[in-house]
A protein has these predicted regions:
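NAD(P)+-binding Rossmann beta1-loop-alpha1 motif at the extreme N-terminus of oxidoreductases
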Residues: 1-62, 86, 123-126, 327
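Short glycine-/small-residue-rich Rossmann-like dinucleotide-binding loops
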Residues: 67-69, 94, 119, 152
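Rossmann-fold NAD(P)-binding glycine/threonine-rich loop
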Residues: 85-88, 92-142
């Protein structure tokens, strides 16, 4: 099948490579000509403009957008006038499902089809395959199945689920038509909210292990410091790289995320290349908005989202307010920041 790909960033380019390896034909475009040229040197058909890309595609066309959510509308403003009835636009980025519904209605008025695809797999997807969560019209999604099946990991990516009827759904292949327009990005939104929680649990657990030698370090004994009452219980120097490694092997908390952090800790036990400012790209906020609208409790997901805000310094003023109040009502002096802990073991 032929596909136009707009956006050749860290995922888009590798998706094209996986599609090409799987015998699908791609025509590619990016606002950065160098990104197009790199794939052209690998034998992929490059386009010099959106007009050129559309002209090179057979009708009815299928065009996949792999661009940041913030630029989807701007890209569509330029792309849609070039398309014809029956053409398909696929948004494979992390758009808000509300926007999918709006955009789909706008395109339907022009007799164009819109499909939303939540794409998970990151930079490893080229080899591992991509988990695809899809929303849109059934017949349109079925038309695109050669693309989805090529991008997806396939049934061999995970053991068969006990009690499940084999072949009952494309979910076993790593792609799923989740429902009508917006459903794909809704499922991906919640997926990313869960991802936030998993990442935070690993981070907090490893941090507790890192500070398990607290009993070896003297603390000031005054009214401003909560004493460590039994320092003899905190005398451990843990090798976090080794702990992450042993957890990978047969542990109930084993996962790809753990594989990644184990590899990082093996090369940089102190994680010195990271400042600890954790971004959030929108999906966590949208997940919480959905939970509030649905009246569904999600305390873990809300806590980890707020923790990301705090990591970027957004809590600094609030903390200064707290410190000022303690000083004003009780004369409590503010303690200087503790030096960063060094690596263990």
């Amino acid at each position: 099948m032929q596909l136009g790909m707009i956006g050749l960033g860290r995922m888009g380019a590798d998706m094209v490579r996986r599609l090409t390896k799987g015998a699908q034909q791609c025509v590619v475009y990016d606002v950065q000509p160098a990104a197009v040229e790199r794939l052209a040197q690998e034998g992929v058909t490059g386009a010099s403009s959106l007009e050129d890309l559309v002209a090179r595609l057979d009708k009815p066309r299928a065009v996949w957008l792999m661009v940041p959510a913030a630029v989807v509308d701007g890209t569509l403003e330029k792309l849609v006038p070039l398309l014809e009835p029956g053409d398909i636009v696929i948004d494979g980025g992390n758009s808000y499902y509300h926007d999918d519904i709006r955009r789909g209605a706008d395109l339907a008025a022009r007799k164009l089809h819109y499909v939303d695809v939540g794409t998970s797999g990151g930079v490893a997807g080229r080899e591992r395959g991509y988990c695809l969560m899809i929303g849109g019209e059934t017949q349109v999604v079925e038309r695109l199945e050669p693309i989805f099946s090529t991008l997806a990991p396939g049934a061999a990516a995970a053991p068969a689920t006990s009690g499940r009827n084999p072949g009952s759904s494309t979910a076993e292949q790593g792609f799923l038509h989740c429902g009508p327009l917006g459903a794909g990005h809704f499922v991906k939104m919640v997926h990313n909210g869960i991802e936030y929680g998993l990442m935070a649990a690993y981070a907090e657990g490893l941090n507790i292990l890192r500070h398990a030698d607290a009993g070896k370090h003297a603390r000031e004994a005054d009214a401003e410091t909560s004493p460590l009452r039994r320092p003899q219980l905190y005398q451990y120097d843990f090798n976090l790289a080794d702990i992450a490694e042993v957890w990978r092997r047969g542990s109930v908390i084993g996962s790809w995320l753990l594989d990644l952090i184990a590899g990082t800790l093996a090369g940089d036990a102190d994680l010195q290349q990271y400042a600890g400012r954790v971004s959030d790209s929108g999906e966590g906020r949208w997940t919480m908005s959905a939970a509030i609208d649905e009246g569904v409790p999600a305390p873990v997901l809300s806590a980890v989202l707020f923790a990301r805000f705090s990591s970027r310094g957004e809590a600094d003023f609030a903390n200064r307010v707290l410190s000022a109040m303690r000083h004003d009502f009780g004369g409590h002096a503010e303690k200087p920041a503790a030096p960063p802990a060094s690596s263990q073991g």
